[in-house]
From Swiss-Prot:
This is Probable transcriptional regulatory protein SRU_2667. The keyword Ribosomal protein does not apply. GO terms for molecular function: DNA binding. It comes from the Bacteria. Coiled coil: none annotated. It is found in: Cytoplasm. Pfam families: TACO1_YebC_N, Transcrip_reg. It comes from Salinibacter ruber (strain DSM 13855 / M31). Residues 1-25 are annotated as: Disordered. InterPro entries: Integrase-like_N, TACO1_YebC-like_2nd/3rd_dom, TACO1_YebC_N, Transcrip_reg_TACO1-like, Transcrip_reg_TACO1-like_dom3, YebC-like. Transmembrane segments: none annotated.
Amino acid sequence: MAGHTRKWAKVKRKKQKDDRRKSKVWARLSQEIEKAAREGGGDPDANVALSQALERAREEDMAKDTIERAIKRGTGELEEEGREKVTYEGYAPHGVAVFVEGETENINRTVKDLRNLFSDHGGNLGKDGSVAYLFEQKGRFEIAADATDEMTLFEVAVEAGAEEVDETDGTYVVTTGRDAFADVGEALDEAGLPVEANALVRAPTTTVALAPDERDAVRGLIEKINDLRDVTSVYTTLEIDGTPLALGVDVASPAGH
């Protein structure tokens, strides 16, 4: 029976992990849908960003009523009390700044969970503003490389205010300042360029490179923070292979680079 017990415990842990992942993915998709509906209306036929968010939600088997509530929150037809968007700031070991975004109905629980994790791993949860100045918001758009040529995309995006256009792993990545995010998105839509994903992300203005053992320790803390039920994304100033470590999101390169 001991073998069966261990096997069941292993299966149960895997299911719990899968359930946590699904819950976090759905939370992020709900935010995407709500944001798209708020900015472009609740009709997916007339709102490219909403249509794309709904497609991703269906791929993740997101419940229909959950999708409908997110759309109605975005259009203002539904107001749900209890959950609110939150941000937290702190330092991981070795001077790595950490910026956390989340959504919670129990702020005391969220703060306690974060404070315990930071403390247990040699870091500390700071006050508002303690590390926010080390990050700036950037807009990010992803377009399949086979959907257009780089020159056409570059001309459309830069004319609308984009900062740069890069290609990585078969995808064009357009980076904008926060204020140009909406204008660039509209320009891409009008040009008929299919955006696969878009988001406002946080880019560090400076990064920290660490020795492998130090880097792994910091990454372990960040992964545990990202696993918390109320956390949707985590940004850091830790650089790994030329890219700032961020979980729950795609992150822009260091600001100004």
